[in-house]
C-alpha cells in the first residue's frame, strides 16, 4: 500500500492554471498534489552571444525553491552567492526538454526565459516544473501570435512536453512519487516525453538495489500512461 493510498498507476491530483501572472507573457500555476510550482515565460529581444546573427531563437530556463517550500527553511541561493549543483542540473533539464519541440528558427532572434519557482515541495518538483513550463511557454507563444510576431505559418511548438516520476516502492512499480515514497523507494526515475510518446530524457537511479530491464520497462509503461494524462490536461489548459 502506498502512503498516499493511490493505486500504483494513479497520478496525484494535478492542476494546470494558465495566465496567472499579470505581467508575464506566459504563466502557469502547476500543482502535482502538494507540490506547487509557479512558472512564468518571458519574451526577450536578446540572445546568448554565440547565437547572434544566426536567425534563430532560444528557450532557456531557471529554477529555484522558496525558502519555506520545504519542511525546514532552506537558505536562499542568492544569499549563498551561487547556485547548487541540483539547481543547475534541473534548470538545464527544463531548458533541454522545452527546446526539444520548439522550432527555434520560427521563433526568430528572440529568447524566451522560463522561470520555475517552487512554492511548496512534496516530491517531483522537476517533473511538475517541466509540465507547467510547457503550458507557460505555449501561453507566451500564443501571446506572440496575437501580435503577429511570426512570419511564417509553421507551428512554433511542434508537440507537447510533459514529465513524470516513477519508482519501485516496496517492490511495486508506481507512478508519480510524492516525498514519502521517493525517500523510501528502491528505485526512482524521471521520464520526459512528447505528446506522441517519444522520449526526450530519462533519469533513473537505483537508490537501494539495482533494477532489472523488466522493471525498467514497467516503469516506462507507467510513465507513458502518466504523460498521456498530463498532455490531456495541458491541452485543456491552453484551449
From Swiss-Prot:
It comes from the Bacteria. Pfam families: RNase_PH (PF01138), RNase_PH_C (PF03725). Keywords: Nucleotidyltransferase, RNA-binding, rRNA processing, Transferase, tRNA processing, tRNA-binding. It is an enzyme of class 2 (transferase). It catalyses: tRNA(n+1) + phosphate = tRNA(n) + a ribonucleoside 5'-diphosphate. Disulfide bonds: none annotated. GO terms for molecular function: 3'-5'-RNA exonuclease activity; tRNA binding; tRNA nucleotidyltransferase activity. InterPro entries: ExoRNase_PH_dom1 (IPR001247), ExoRNase_PH_dom2 (IPR015847), ExoRNase_PH_dom2_sf (IPR036345), PNPase/RNase_PH_dom_sf (IPR027408), Ribosomal_Su5_D2-typ_SF (IPR020568), RNase_PH (IPR050080), RNase_PH_bac-type (IPR002381), RNase_PH_CS (IPR018336). Phosphate binds at residues 86, 124-126. GO terms for biological process: rRNA catabolic process; rRNA processing; tRNA processing. Phosphorolytic 3'-5' exoribonuclease that plays an important role in tRNA 3'-end maturation. Removes nucleotide residues following the 3'-CCA terminus of tRNAs; can also add nucleotides to the ends of RNA molecules by using nucleoside diphosphates as substrates, but this may not be physiologically important. Probably plays a role in initiation of 16S rRNA degradation (leading to ribosome degradation) during starvation. Belongs to the RNase PH family. Homohexameric ring arranged as a trimer of dimers. This is Ribonuclease PH.
